[in-house]
Amino acid sequence: MFECNDCLMQGFEQMNRQLTDAEALAGHLVPAGSMFAFLAAHRAELFPDAGYADLFAPPGVGRPSLPATRMAAVLTLQVLHDYSDRETAEAVRFDVRWKVAIGASLDDPGYDPSSLVYWRNRIARSERPHRISDAVSKVVRETGVLKGRRRRAVDSTILADAVATRTP
């Protein structure tokens, strides 16, 4: 019998666009080749739902989570911008570039900053705690977002607080 004190079944991104879809209405405002445009075009490949299934209870157990494709894109942008959880939640709510990158609608209210803590903790406890840092590295390679900067540290050091592994 399956028991879970922290049960969430996996939530999935709805691929059908809403009337107020940020990419459809304002995607032209996001510079081509930017990390935002890259995430908008490739987030489903970078963060496939199957790659996060290990974080959740079996289907039908618990309430649905926020979609992994969206939350992984948010955590990636948070690292690249060096934002706090509150700043990240505000960017998701108010910044059109972020809405386009994560696949949100323009009127999407976002979520509480504690959702980021929850996701980081789930990822940190998983068998693949570096999946976000791996994605950050790929975004940096593909977009050159750090091009021209002297320091190019994109390793687990910058994610120490974000995705620290715990010892049992």
Report each predicted region and the residues it spans.
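Charged, often Cys/His-bearing segments associated with DNA-binding zinc-finger transcription factors
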Residues: 1-46
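Short, positively charged, Gly/Tyr-enriched micro-motifs
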Residues: 64-126
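Basic, short loop/linker segments at the boundary and entry of helix-turn-helix/winged-helix-like folds
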Residues: 30, 35-73, 80-81
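Short acidic (Asp/Glu) and glycine-rich catalytic loops that position anionic groups and cofactors
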Residues: 19, 52-54, 115-116
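Active-site- or DNA-interface-adjacent structural scaffold in DNA-acting proteins
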Residues: 106-168
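Solvent-exposed, flexible loop/coil residues
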Residues: 23, 50, 56-60, 70, ...
